[in-house]
A protein has these predicted regions:
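Eukaryotic gene-expression regulator signature that favors modular helical reader/repeat domains
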Residues: 1-177
Length: 177
């Protein structure tokens, strides 16, 4: 499938993504393979448009642990904002997939107080789902108690039919049984 830049003249090339989610033709992103450019300004790549987000998702997986740490340190204060961004949330999912326990704990602590709101958000829900899949069962159980109490205060029966929240609830159920 070919992803086109957004209507405002994307600064990124049109890139061809294969079904596995990675960039098919590495030449399509040759000018953006400068690691220093990516490491120095990851937010530019993440927030501009779909192509920028796809570029950083693909390249992040190829970086060294030190380079990944540099990017993480530049964006960690924006985790909440990026998790709800229509393009950047996909990178936050990749970040969680590629992270060690320390980074996952940081992301968890950044999002845990707003878990319910993120679970209802059409972009944030992907981040919460991936995060729940990475957390230890003990943390999931503690989080479930807080989440459940919050749900009961927010008309849980009505909100449980929300498609995004429902996906999060399914992960909770799988993880705590």
């Amino acid at each position: 499938m070919n992803y086109q830049g957004s209507q405002y003249n994307s600064p990124f090339p049109n890139i061809n993504i294969i079904d596995g989610g990675s960039i098919q033709n590495e030449d399509d992103i040759k000018e953006f393979q400068n690691k220093e450019e990516l490491i120095n300004n990851p937010l530019y790549f993440l927030q501009k448009d779909e192509n920028g987000s796809k570029i950083i998702q693909d390249l992040y997986k190829k970086l060294t642990p030190n380079e990944k740490n540099q990017i993480f340190n530049k964006i960690k204060s924006k985790i909440k904002e990026l998790s709800k961004n229509e393009f950047a949330n996909y990178f936050i999912v990749v970040l969680i997939e590629e992270s060690d326990k320390e980074k996952i704990d940081f992301i968890y602590n950044a999002l845990k107080d707003d878990l319910f709101e993120f679970s209802l958000d059409k972009h944030g829900t992907y981040v919460i789902q991936e995060l729940l899949n990475k957390l230890d069962k003990k943390i999931i159980e503690e989080l479930w108690d807080k989440f459940y109490n919050h749900c009961n205060n927010q008309n849980f029966e009505e909100k449980a039919f929300d498609q995004n929240l429902n996906h999060v609830l399914q992960i909770f159920i799988k993880k705590i049984k």
